[in-house]
Amino acid sequence: MFKGSIVALITPMDEKGQICRISLEKLINYHVASKTEAIVSIGTTGESATLSQEEHINIVMLTLELADGRIPVIAGTGANATTEAISLTKRFEKSGVAGCLSVTPYYNRPTQEGLYQHFKAISENTELPQILYNVPSRTGCDLLPETVAKLSHFNNIIGIKEATGDLSRIHKIKELVKTNFLLISGDDATALDFMQLGGQGVISVTANIAAKEMMEICSYALKGDFINARSINKRLMLLHEALFIEPNPIPVKWLAKKIGLIKSDTLRLPMTPVLDSTRFQLEKAIQYANLKIS
C-alpha cells in the first residue's frame, strides 16, 4: 500500500507560532510535483508534541484539503495513553486519510505486553490501516520483533516504521511477520541499506528538502538498481546527517526556509532556533547535495 519515499512533513508556522496555510500549500504542491508517494501529517517532524489535540486534528484536515486527493495523507495518531490514541484515530475515520502512523507510547515505558495490548486496542477500534512506529531514542521503549510479529496478525496493522537504525532488525522482523507486512525505514542515513535488505521505503525527514532525490533513490531501489540509488544517496549523506545535528525538526525547518519552501522556521518551545554552528554544516550539506529545487 505505501512504498517508496514518504515525507514526514514539517508543520510550517508564522512568526507568532500559528499554522501558515500558504507555506503548507507550497510544501504539498512541492511533494506532488516531486512524486513523493505520501505525506505523514503531524508525526515527530510535524511537531505533534507541541500541538494541542484540536490543532493536531485541524492541521491533518487542512493537509487533506490542500492535497485534494493528489497525494495520500497518513495521519500521525500516536499517544502515550491508549484511550487518547483511540480517540484521535477515530476522529480521522471518515476524513479521507489513507492510514495512521502510531508511535509507541512514550515516557511511561510499557512492557512488551503493554505495547501489544495498546496497539491491539487501537486496531480493534478502527478500520483504518495502521503503521506501527518504533523510535526508542524518542520514546524510551522498544517494540521488539516478536511483539511486531504478534501484532502483524491484525488485518489493519499493515506495517512498521522502524527507526532504530539497527539494520539487523529487518532480518528479525522479516523472519517473523506475514509476507505482505510493510517494512519502512525511519532513518534516512540507513534507509537505502534497509531497502536493499527487503524494506519497501522510508518515512523521510530529508524528503522535506530533497523530495525528488529521495523519490529517485527509492524508485531505483524498488527496481533493484542499487548502483543508481547509491549514486544519488552518496550526495545526500551529509544532508541526512546534518539534519540530525540538533533535535529534529530544528535543522530541517531552518533549511526549508533557507531554500524558500516555507516563510518562517518558527518552532514552539521547548524547541529553539538552530545554532550558528549547525547552519554552517547545513549549508555545506546542501551545496554538496546539489539539489533540484522546484
Swiss-Prot record:
- Give the E.C. number(s): 4.3.3.7
An example GO BP is: lysine biosynthetic process via diaminopimelate
Q: Which reactions does this protein catalyse?
A: L-aspartate 4-semialdehyde + pyruvate = (2S,4S)-4-hydroxy-2,3,4,5-tetrahydrodipicolinate + H2O + H(+)
Q: Which UniProt keywords apply?
A: Amino-acid biosynthesis, Cytoplasm, Diaminopimelate biosynthesis, Lyase, Lysine biosynthesis, Schiff base
Q: Where is this site: Part of a proton relay during catalysis?
A: 44, 107
Q: InterPro entries per the record?
A: Aldolase_TIM, DapA, DapA-like, Schiff_base-form_aldolases_AS, Schiff_base-form_aldolases_CS
Quaternary structure note: Homotetramer; dimer of dimers.
Describe the family membership recorded for this protein in Swiss-Prot or TrEMBL.
Belongs to the DapA family.
- The name this protein goes by in its record: 4-hydroxy-tetrahydrodipicolinate synthase
What species is this protein from?
Buchnera aphidicola subsp. Acyrthosiphon pisum (strain APS) (Acyrthosiphon pisum symbiotic bacterium)
Q: What is the lineage of its organism?
A: Bacteria, Pseudomonadati, Pseudomonadota, Gammaproteobacteria, Enterobacterales
Gene that this polypeptide is encoded by: dapA
